C-alpha cells in the first residue's frame, strides 16, 4: 500500500509570540500546502514520531523509544487534550515487527503526550482524533541519548512494519530544527527541578502556567537578542534538509550527539523525529521530496521547517 511523509517543526510559541505578518503568512501557506498534500493522499493511518518535553515521559522511566497502543494528550500550551484516535491493532503489529527486527522499543497502553504530538496533528489534519494514529515517542531531550543511527534503524523497522498493514500510511515527524529553548538539563538542574524531571506529572494549573510563561518570556528575549540560549543555525538546518532529500540518510550516522548540541542547540535532537520518518519512507524504496519550506524564526525559538515526500515507483 502507498506511503507518504510530512515532517514539520512545532513550537508552543505559535500564536503567543509571533513574528512579522509576512512570516506568519509564509508559514500558513506552507501548512496549507501540507494539508492539501495529506488530503490528496488520504491516509488510512498516521504513524507520528514526536518527542516529549517533560509533560508525559519522565526520568523515573525514560525509554529511548516508545510505541503507544493508547495515548492521552495533556493539553499543554492550549493544544487539544484528551485521547488520541490510536489504532491499537496497528500499534501492536508495528511493535512486534520492530522488536523482531532487533530494535528495542518500549510499549505503552497509557502513553501521555504533549504539544509535540498534538500540535502536529491539529495543524496537519485538524484534530488529534481526525485520523487513526500510531504514536511513537522518541526521547530527544533527556540525556543520555543513544546514537542517531539507532533512530534510523527504528524508522526503517517501522517502515517495514507499515508495509504489512494493508493501509495508506502517512509518516509524520514533529520537531526541530535547530533550537535551544529553556529546557532544564538534569545534570545541572537544582534538586527541586530534578524532582520535577523525575516525576512532574499532574502539575497544578498555576505550575503549568508559570512553566509556559517562562518559555514565552524566553522567546521574547531571544527575538530581542538578549537571551542566553544558543542561536539558531540555518546553515545546519539546510544541510540536514539536503541530506534527508538526498535519500542517503546513513550519512547522519556519523553525527555525534555532542555535535548536534554544539551546532544547533540542545533541542536540535528533536530532528530525530524527521530522521525516523524519512527512514521509514526509505524502507519502501526510493522517495521524492515534493515540497520543502524553511524559515529562521527567532520569535518561536526555531529553525522552522516543513517537508512532504512520496514514494517513487521503480
Swiss-Prot record:
Any one GO molecular function term: ferrous iron binding
Associated pathway: Aromatic compound metabolism; 3-phenylpropanoate degradation
Active-site feature positions: 115 (proton donor), 179 (proton acceptor)
Catalysed reaction equations from the record: 3-(2,3-dihydroxyphenyl)propanoate + O2 = (2Z,4E)-2-hydroxy-6-oxonona-2,4-dienedioate + H(+); (2E)-3-(2,3-dihydroxyphenyl)prop-2-enoate + O2 = (2Z,4E,7E)-2-hydroxy-6-oxonona-2,4,7-trienedioate + H(+)
GO terms under biological process: 3-phenylpropionate catabolic process
Source species, domain of life: Bacteria
Enzyme Commission code: 1.13.11.16
Keywords: Aromatic hydrocarbons catabolism, Dioxygenase, Iron, Oxidoreductase
A matching Pfam family: LigB
CC cofactor: Fe(2+)
HAMAP family: MhpB
Family statement: Belongs to the LigB/MhpB extradiol dioxygenase family.
Subunit structure: Homotetramer.
Function: Catalyzes the non-heme iron(II)-dependent oxidative cleavage of 2,3-dihydroxyphenylpropionic acid and 2,3-dihydroxicinnamic acid into 2-hydroxy-6-ketononadienedioate and 2-hydroxy-6-ketononatrienedioate, respectively.
Name of the protein in question: 2,3-dihydroxyphenylpropionate/2,3-dihydroxicinnamic acid 1,2-dioxygenase
Organism annotation: Rhodococcus jostii (strain RHA1)
Amino acid at each position: 500500500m502507498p506511503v507518504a511523509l510530512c515532517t514539520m517543526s512545532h513550537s508552543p510559541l505559535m500564536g503567543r509570540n509571533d513574528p512579522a505578518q509576512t512570516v506568519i503568512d509564509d508559514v500558513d501557506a506552507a501548512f496549507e500546502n501540507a494539508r492539501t498534500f495529506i488530503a490528496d493522499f488520504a491516509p488510512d493511518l498516521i504513524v507520528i514520531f514526536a518527542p516529549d518535553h517533560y509533560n508525559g515521559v519522565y526520568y523515573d522511566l525514560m525509554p529511548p523509544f516508545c510505541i503507544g497502543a493508547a495515548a492521552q494528550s495533556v493539553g499543554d500550551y492550549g493544544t487539544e487534550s484528551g485521547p488520541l484516535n490510536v489504532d491499537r491493532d496497528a500499534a501492536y503489529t508495528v511493535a512486534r515487527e520492530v522488536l523482531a527486527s532487533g530494535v528495542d522499543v518500549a510499549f505503552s497502553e497509557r502513553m501521555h503526550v504533549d504539544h509535540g504530538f498534538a500540535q502536529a496533528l491539529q495543524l496537519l489534519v485538524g484534530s488529534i482524533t481526525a485520523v487513526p494514529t500510531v504514536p511513537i515517542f522518541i526521547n530527544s531531550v533527556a540525556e543520555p541519548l543513544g546514537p542517531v543511527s539507532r533512530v534510523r534503524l527504528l524508522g526503517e523497522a517501522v517502515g517495514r512494519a507499515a508495509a504489512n498493514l494493508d493501509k495508506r500510511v502517512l509518516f509524520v515527524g514533529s520537531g526541530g530544527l535547530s533550537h535551544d529553548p529553556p529546557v532544564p538539563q538534569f545534570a545541572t538542574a537544582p534538586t527541586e527541578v530534578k524532582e520535577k524531571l523525575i516525576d512532574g506529572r499532574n502539575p497544578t494549573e498555576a505550575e503549568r502556567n508559570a512553566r509556559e510563561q517562562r518559555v514565552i518570556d524566553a522567546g521574547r528575549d531571544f527575538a530581542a537578542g538578549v537571551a542566553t540560549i544558543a542561536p539558531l543555525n540555518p546553515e545546519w538546518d539546510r544541510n540536514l534538509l539536503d541530506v534527508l532529500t538526498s535519500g542517503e540518510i546513513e550519512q547522519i550516522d556519523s553525527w555525534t550527539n555532542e555535535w548536534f548540541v554544539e551546532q544547533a542547540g540542545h533541542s536540535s535532537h528533536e530532528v530525530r523525529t524527521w530522521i525516523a520518518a524519512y527512514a521509514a519512507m526509505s524502507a519502501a524504496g526510493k522517495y521524492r521530496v515534493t515540497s520543502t519550506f524553511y524559515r529562521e524564526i527567532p520569535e518561536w525559538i526555531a529553525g522552522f521547517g516543513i517537508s512532504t515526500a512520496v514514494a517513487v515507483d521503480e
